[in-house]
Amino acid sequence: MIEQQKKYRWVIVVIAVLSLMISNGLAIGGLPPFYKPIREEFVAIGAIDASWAETFIGNSANITFLISGISSLIGGWFISRSGLRPVMLLGCVLLGGGLLIHSQASSAEVVYAARGLMGASLGFIGVAPCVVLVSKWFDKGRGTALGIVLTGTSLGGAAIPLVAAPLIARYGWRYTMVALTSTVWLILFPAIAFLVREPSLKTSEPADIAANDGMTIGEAVRTPLFWAFGACAALVFYPIFVTSQQFILYLQSPKIGVSAETAAFAQSALFAISIGGKFLAGTLSDKFRAIRVMVGCSLLMFAASLVLLGLTADNSLYFLLPFAIGYGGTFVLLQRLAADFFGRREIGKILGLITLIEVTGAAIGGRITGYLADRNGGDYTYAFFGVTIASALAFLATLAIFALHKKRLENAL
C-alpha cells in the first residue's frame, strides 16, 4: 500500500465514526429522551391507549431493529455490486426522510412507518457497511481501527441525549427532532459524497491478498461456528438493546424515581463509558487473541447485570459502569471476529446475516421488556431480570465459540 493510501485510510476511519455517530445516534441511541414526551402526548391526544403505552415504545424500537437486520442483508448484496458510496448515500436519504416523517406523526402507524425507514437506513449506513468499509482499508491494526470506528455508535448515544433533553424541555420533541435531522443533510451526506472511496490500487500488502480470501455466505452457514456465533450475537444484543433503549424509562419509574434530566445523563454516561470499552477491546484484540478478550468482556457484562436484581438509584452506577465497558468490548469483537472467522470474501453478506440475527435477539428483548413492564403497571423491575438472564447465556455462548474455534484450529494442524 502506497504512503498516500496509508494516510487516507484514517480519513475513512473518521468518516465511518461520523456515519455511526449520526446514524445510530439518531435512529437508536439518541432517541430515548424522546420516548416519554412522545408517549405522554400520544396518550393525551388519544392516539394510543395508556394501557399499552410501554408496548408502543417497545414496538417502535423493535421495528427499527428488525428492519435494520433485513436491510443489512439487502445492503450487503448492494455493496458487492454497487460499492459503498452509493449505498451509504441511500442510507442518508432513508434516515433523513424517516426522521422528518416521525417529527410530524400523530398516530402509532405513522411512527411505526417512520421507524421502519430509520431502521432500513442502518443497513446502508450503519455498523455493517462501516465495518466492511474499514476492513477494506486495514489488515494490520484492524482491531484498533474497528475499535475507534465503533465508538461512533456510543458517541452518538452519548451526545444526542445531552443535546436533545434541554431542547425538548424548551421547544418540544417535534422541533428538536427536525433540528437534529439537519445533521444528516448538512454534514453526513456531503461527507460521504465527497470523501468515501475504496482502495484503488492493488499491492502485495496482506490487506489486498486477504480481501478475496475466506468463505462464501453459503459455506459459512454450514459451519457450527457460525450458528454459535449467531446465538451469541442474539444473546448479547438482548441486554444491549434493552439497556440502551428502556433503561432510561426504568430510571424514571416510581420505584427508582430519578428526573428526566438525570435519566438522560445516565443514558449518555452508558454510551460514553462504552467508548472506553470499545477502544480498549479493539486495542487488546491486536495484542492478544480476540476471542479471549471477548470472553472477558462478556463475563464483565454478566457480572454487572447482577446489580439489576436489586437496582436502586444509589447503586445504579455499579451497574452502568462495568456493563458499559463489557458491552462496548463485546460489541466491537463480534464485528472483528466475524471477519477473522469467516474471512473477507463475502464479509458484507455475512455481516448482514449476523446483523439480522442480532436484531432478532434485540427485538425479542424489547418486546418482552415492554410487555412485562405493562403487566406490572409500568414497573420495569421484573422486566430487567431478563437482562441478567440473557447476559449469563451470552457469556456461556462466548465459551462455546472459544471451544469451537479452538477445535477448528486443532483440526487445521
Each model region followed by its residue ranges:
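Extracytoplasmic gate region of multi-pass secondary transporters
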Residues: 28-38, 218, 224-281, 365, ...
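Helix-loop-helix hairpin linking two adjacent transmembrane segments in secondary transporters
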Residues: 152-199
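Cytoplasmic helix-loop-helix junction between adjacent transmembrane helices
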Residues: 116-151, 343
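A late C-terminal transmembrane helix in Major Facilitator Superfamily
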Residues: 148, 157, 341-377
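C-terminal transmembrane helical hairpin of 12-TM major facilitator-type secondary transporters
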Residues: 268-337
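Conserved MFS/SLC helix-loop-helix module at the cytosolic interface between two early adjacent transmembrane helices
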Residues: 70-108
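Extracytoplasmic
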Residues: 11-44, 50-54, 71, 243-248, ...
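Paired small-residue
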Residues: 98, 109-117, 315-322
